[in-house]
Amino acid sequence: YKRQIYFASLGISGYLAYYFIDSYLCLIFFFIYGTIWAFSVSNWHETVHRTAFKTRWLNEIVYHISCFMGDFEAYRWRWSHTFHHSNTYQTKDDYDHDIQITRPTELLAFFLNFIPFADLLFPHKLLKYEIIKNSFRKLSPVIAITAPDSEKNKIVWNSRFYVFLWLVIIAYSFWIGSILPVIYILLPNYYGKPIQFFVNVTQHLGAPFDKKDHRESTYSVKINPIFAFLYCCLLYTSDA
């Protein structure tokens, strides 16, 4: 029922943004809507581990929906996340592509995460850009490291499916003469990211480097109930 509340909250905030479209209030509700949308990354994380629901098929459905929402191509990220859990903070040899903060830390890029739309200043770093490249079979290095050859065609064709849906949304916006479909579906990750990033970046804070023993990578955080709900209550964790 918690994920039902999540999607209901997304729908209600989206409706209120549209209802107040002629008022500055719409900016507040779009920010709320974008923030809830951006937290789809938490749904993605719990469903890839199949801990959100009791049944595998329901986890799989919500996983694919959340992947599309968060620009996480489903097959690429299933394998890269498996690789991520083979180690703690991995700094040697093959790099862990699931870690949000680079080493050495790019401070400008880090702080820009707290500014809406700042990601668009670096289009070559966007997940959408990676998906577009993958759709042309120009597979990213992380795929070569983590995904078996048998999965690469799935990554290519699913990337093409994502790009097709994006083009349909853009074409529909032109057809109806409104940018709203783009604002509602293609841009929320960019204007709704600041709070989501602030919460999500706690996920690996304090983890030791290059340790196979995941018992050394436990952590606890405390956040308010609303953010905890959006974060799927990922507050007490062993990174295993």
Protein language model annotation of sequence segments:
Residues 1-36, 43, 60, 68-186, ...:
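Non-catalytic, topology-defining segments of multipass membrane proteins
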Residues 35-44, 73, 186-210:
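Transmembrane alpha-helical segments that form the membrane-embedded catalytic/substrate-channel core
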Residues 44-50:
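His-Asp-centered metal-binding catalytic motifs of divalent-metal-dependent phosphohydrolases/nucleases
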Residues 50-51, 56:
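Membrane-anchoring hydrophobic segments
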Residues 80-84, 201, 213:
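Catalytic core of nucleotide-sugar-dependent glycosyltransferases
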Residues 218-234:
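Cytosolic juxtamembrane regulatory segments of multi-pass membrane proteins
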